[in-house]
Amino acid sequence: EYALLTGIPAPGFKATKSGETYDIKAYEEFCKAISQQIPNCKYIYIALRNVMSSEHHTFAGVLYSHGTMKYTRVFDIDNVIDCVGVGDAFCGAMLYAQHAYEDEQKRVDFSTADSVLKNTIAGDYNIVKVSEVEGLLAKHESGEVAR
């Protein structure tokens, strides 16, 4: 959506498994350009998805704020049940995290992990608990999702 709003082309996200890296520098430059066009925007969150098949996606998130970039590891979701509502889950978790956590890295980690879990739930509504999101962050350093 940022690319549509600003006319600035977004970098591609091509990670195919957990443990892969993605071009953080390109996303940082993208976010800097957005912040120049929209100077009153304090936080730029971006959810990143690559779809290998209907059941296999990778997912990550970035947050640009006050000239600094925070980013998550790549999550490998090989048991996607329903990807409808994943963006809504990301936004809802972002709003929750903005108020629940001081640390910006924790905010983007939480928002991303919440969205990752939503991929494993049928329907448009995300019904995961905060404890499930925090559990995914604590237990799955590899980025692979098992639910």
Show where each model-derived region lies.
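Conserved phosphate-binding/catalytic region of the ribokinase-like
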Residues: 10-147
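A generic structural signal for short hydrophobic patches within well-formed alpha-helices
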Residues: 2-3, 133
